[in-house]
Amino acid sequence: MLNIRQERIKEYVEKNNVATIRELQVLFPKVSLMTIHRDLDALESKGVLVKFRGGARSVRHTGDPEFDVRMRENNGGKRVIADKAMSLLQPHTSIFLDASTTNLILAKNLPDINLNIITTGPNIAIELCRLHNPVVTLCCGLINRKNLAVSGQNTLEMLEKMNIDMAFIGVSGCSVDAGFTCGTEADMLVKRLAIQKAHTSVVMCGSDKFNCLMPYTFAKLPDVDYVVTEGNVPDAFRGAAEKAGVKLL
């Protein structure tokens, strides 16, 4: 039999399909993190939900939980970043959108203007199909089910043939010393090449990513032109960006 708190967790997960640990901590502010994990373990043992790193999902939910969690993290901030990034767009140009969740939000809110859009995000390409004017190219390659991104040698060879005016790149971590970082070598290679190919590169960095470090660096500050964020920029990073000639939005 479930206790009252576990019943509320069950109802929350069934309603939202996915619950992050952070959301459950907000839902139960007086309950310890250890207790929340024990509740999730108990609910999983009863077949109510399935745990994953950072949260739990409904047994009926078939989507990728890690992608859902990333979409919900700092969602309001990502919309602010996407809006700022869109202010840089010029019609009749060629742009690259990597498979980041911020770029998915950008795609959902993109105006119907003449653009040549190249993307490594299948879900981004599908979202852009609602528009009539952009020409959309989805890069070929292997699909990573966790982040819904295509990558690999075929992706790189295709990107190498593309001419890109402006690249919009998401990050998983950002610091003065390490630069802009991500979680996999495959993503690093795609992001790095897109920045090299682009005339102008725009890195979209949530304020929660500053001073976070991921395994792979795909660019340093002098390699990019803009850093777009929604919150306060650490003084050390601001100073380094100004020294490198990088514009902060």
Predicted regions and their residues:
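HTH-adjacent hinge/linker in prokaryotic transcriptional regulators
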Residues: 2-4, 14-22, 27-99, 108-111, ...
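Pre-recognition alpha-helix immediately N-terminal to the DNA-recognition helix
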Residues: 7-11
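Conserved phosphate- and dinucleotide-binding cores of soluble alpha/beta proteins
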Residues: 23, 126-249
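Short glycine-enriched loops at secondary-structure junctions
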Residues: 55, 123-124
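Short beta-strand scaffold positions
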Residues: 97-98, 119, 229
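Alpha-helix/helix-capping structural signal
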Residues: 101, 122-123, 232
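N-terminal active-site wall of soluble small-molecule enzyme domains
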Residues: 105
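Conserved helix-loop-beta element of the AMP-binding
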Residues: 113-116, 227
